Curated annotation (Swiss-Prot):
Protein name (Swiss-Prot/TrEMBL): Short/branched chain specific acyl-CoA dehydrogenase, mitochondrial
Keyword flag GTP-binding: no
Family (UniProt): Belongs to the acyl-CoA dehydrogenase family.
Keyword line: Acetylation, FAD, Fatty acid metabolism, Flavoprotein, Lipid metabolism, Mitochondrion, Oxidoreductase, Phosphoprotein, Transit peptide
Enzyme class at the top of the EC tree: oxidoreductase
CDD domains: SCAD_SBCAD
Native source species: Pongo abelii
Record PTM N6-succinyllysine, positions in chain: 70, 284
Compartments, record wording: Mitochondrion matrix
Database matches in Gene3D superfamilies: Acyl-CoA dehydrogenase/oxidase, N-terminal domain, Butyryl-CoA Dehydrogenase, subunit A, domain 2, Butyryl-CoA Dehydrogenase, subunit A, domain 3
Transit peptide: 1-33
Amino acid sequence: MEGLAVRLLRGSRLLRRNFPTCLSSWKIPPHVSKSSQSEALLNITNNGIHFAPLQTFTDEEMMIKSSVKKFAQEQIAPLVSTMDENSKMEKSVIQGLFQQGLMGIEVDPEYGGTGASFLSTVLVIEELAKVDASVAVFCEIQNTLINTLIRKHGTEEQKGTYLPQLTTEKVGSFCLSEAGAGSDSFALKTRADKEGDYYVLNGSKMWISSAEHAGLFLVMANVDPTIGYKGITSFLVDRDTPGLHIGKPENKLGLRASSTCPLTFENVKVPETNILGQIGHGYKYAIGSLNEGRIGIAAQMLGLAQGCFDYTIPYIKERIQFGKRLFDFQGLQHQVAHVATQLEAARLLTYNAARLLEAGKPFIKEASMAKYYASEIAGQTTSKCIEWMGGVGYTKDYPVEKYFRDAKIGTIYEGASNIQLNTIAKHIDAEY
C-alpha cells in the first residue's frame, strides 16, 4: 500500500499539471499588472521619486479648504433644515457660492475663475457636503461636468461667452438621462435634426439636477439615430430658448434642496455654433466627464458621511446610560473604530483618484472604486449614527436623519454601484 505522503505527492503533481498557466511555476517572477498602482510602485523603485502622503495639501488647497469650511458653517448651516423642508435652495447660498469663487474652481482666471487644482474641487465638495450634500452636488455639477466640458471642448468663442457667466452668475445643468435611458444612457431618444444653420431638438430628459436654477443646459441629443450612440452630440442650450420647457421639481427622499426636474424639447432651435466639440462625439464627452464627476460624487459622499460622524461622536461621548458614557462601552467603541477606518479608506481612495487625474495617469478604475466605496460607506455610516444616537437620531430635530436620506442617492446617480463594479471588473480583466 502506498504511503500517504506518496499519494499526496502524486496528487499535487497531477493538480499542478492542471493549474492555470499563470500558476505554472513559482520560479517565474510574479505578473505585474498595468494598473496605476503598479506604475507608481515602479516609478518609486526605479527613479527614487518621493511621494508625499495623500493628505498633504498645497498652501492654496489648505486655504481653500479652510475658507469653504468657514463659509459652510456660517452661511449654509443655519439654512439647511429650512431648505430641506421647503425643497428649495436659498438664493443667498447660490450667490455665496459664486462670490466665494466656488462655481469656477478650475476655470482660468482669464474667464473669471479661481484657477485652482482638481483636488481643490474635491476638497470644496467634501467640505460643503459635511454641512449639506445638496449644496455640494450643486457645486459639483457646475465644476466637474459643465465647466470641464466647456473648458476641454469649447471653441474660443464658446469659452469666452459662457465661462465668465458660469463663474460669476449662471448655473449650468447636464442633460443626459431620459425615461428610457438611465444606466443605459446611450439609448437616449432626444433628436437633433439639421435645418440650415440650426439644429432642431425634440425629445425629453429626466432627473436633471439644478434645472430649476440653470441658465444654461448642456444637452446630449442624437443627430443620426441610424448609427446609434455615434450620432450623439453635445449642444449648449440657453434657458430662454423657445420650446424648452422645465417641469416641476421632483419630490425626493433626499437632496431635497437640489432641484431635479424633467425637461421637454419641442422644436428647440439651436445654432450650429452651439455644438460643443465635434458632431457625434457627445458620448465620448459624456463618458469622460462622468468619469471625472464620479470622483466628485465620491467626495460628496465622503463629506456627507464625515459630517454625520462628526455630529454623532460628541453626543455618544456625553450621553450617560448605566452610569457611564455610551462611548465607554467596548461594543460601541469597536463599531466607531470600524466606521472611522472605513471613512479613512474612502478618503484615501478619493484623493488617490484625484491625484491620478491631475497627474495625467489612468484613473477610471480608481474613480469607480472611490465612487462605489464612498457611496456604500456613506449609507453604512449614516445608518450607524442613527443607531448610536437612538430615538433622537430618528427625529428631524437632529440632522443625522437627513444625512441618512441624502446618502442613498450616492449608490444611484452618476453611475449606480453595480455599474461601478462592472467598470472595476472590466479593468481588472484587462490588467491581467
